[in-house]
């Protein structure tokens, strides 16, 4: 059984995934500065998503699980560093976008 069927783009300023099947865990390191924002958009057509964002020190700055509906949110960055975005899909179809936004 495939765990992921779709496309993925990831670098130090964004993670974008568009899929018909996402049934695994993926993560991406974003390099952020204080005052910037991580803008997230989730599209859930079926299945569920879990999202966690944490600093390089392991501090969790955002966490949500069992997400069944589409939505968006922003996470304000309070200190410079690497922020790891971890997304887990359970038989999910849809897309996720996490992008660095300045200001």
Give short role names for the model-derived ranges.
Residues 10, 33, 44, 66-68, ...:
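Surface-exposed coil/turn segments at beta-strand junctions on protein surfaces, enriched
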Residues 1-30:
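Transition segment at domain starts
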